[in-house]
């Protein structure tokens, strides 16, 4: 079985968030199961690859051509499409993102002709479901890919007969994610709990009705973690290796983390995107009480400008209690996972989440909200703590409960958990078989 993963990002070539980790790791785990899986990405700026050909495709009624590159990393074959509009620094965040990714998808469908099945990821690849046998994965329902219908049908050449409620239409616009849900043979999302939640008005982002209508082909498969990449026993970013059996090296990591940040323990760490989805407003509101109780806060990430300003101000006002690193720095992230006393994952909603898995693997227990994949991965009261209420008091309660029950002991128990891709890969192989009938 030959499967082409089509996505906007994949580790280690291009990474913005957890989507990249999934697309980089799943194909590697599928190989031993008899699935030949390759990854197709846009040829983003700065990526080096060997040019292996050219792809001809139609866009806006005319033929275009895009160079096709190839690169092998970690045993995975990556293909890069150099369509117009890419070659820039960022993966997302440009005014013409819809046009760029539709052009990419139309070129990708030509590459897909050589495969049995397409595995399309999020809105940027959803269009493939209209052209090829597709398994479509929703990583985050909040980003749906809304496009003006006049532009969409001009760019793609698809018939206007698709612009109705049972197909692509969504409140007067084309919704690419809706198209993926409707036209894919199977739809997956990244945790069992999130698959249930998105069928409700609270979490469905306006697509709950569509998802309920297509519930028969919806599966929730928990993301795995690349346990070769995230392994404290051989992590090159740590000052000393450690394992659950011999955790002595963790003390070295804590010491190095303290030296780098200037924060005395106990330190609560947040590593990830600066986004209100991630519950950072709760962290800011709870911060005065946390500092009063003797906790320190380390925050690392980029994203929303308002949140960035708020954490910069918090650091200025509390130089001994808060440290903010507004950057993507993998070395510091690994040190935080290993050296903090706990990680905070207070999300409003969370399709799966990788931070809580990585931290657990590094023996640092999570304090997480009981939503989505966090419910499926954090063993409450044994290897971390879950809290229900989206309120600063809920977060404070979770932090206090963790330390009352024993944060260090919970961290050691968290290291026992199996977050490898082996189980999820088997589940995806079964979904592929269903999709191919």
Curated annotation (Swiss-Prot):
Its EC number is 2.4.1.21. Synthesizes alpha-1,4-glucan chains using ADP-glucose. Belongs to the glycosyltransferase 1 family. Bacterial/plant glycogen synthase subfamily. One of its GO terms (molecular function) is alpha-1,4-glucan glucosyltransferase (ADP-glucose donor) activity. The keyword Transferase applies. ADP-alpha-D-glucose binds at residue 15. This is Glycogen synthase. It catalyses: [(1->4)-alpha-D-glucosyl](n) + ADP-alpha-D-glucose = [(1->4)-alpha-D-glucosyl](n+1) + ADP + H(+). PANTHER family: ALPHA AMYLASE DOMAIN-CONTAINING PROTEIN, GRANULE-BOUND STARCH SYNTHASE 1, CHLOROPLASTIC/AMYLOPLASTIC. It holds the Pfam family Glycos_transf_1. HAMAP family: Glycogen_synth (MF_00484). Keywords: Glycogen biosynthesis, Glycosyltransferase, Transferase. The keyword Flavoprotein does not apply. GO terms for biological process: glycogen biosynthetic process. It comes from Thermus thermophilus (strain ATCC BAA-163 / DSM 7039 / HB27). It comes from the Bacteria. SUPFAM superfamilies: UDP-Glycosyltransferase/glycogen phosphorylase (SSF53756). Pathway: Glycan biosynthesis; glycogen biosynthesis. InterPro entries: Glyco_trans_1, GS/SS, Starch_synth_cat_dom.
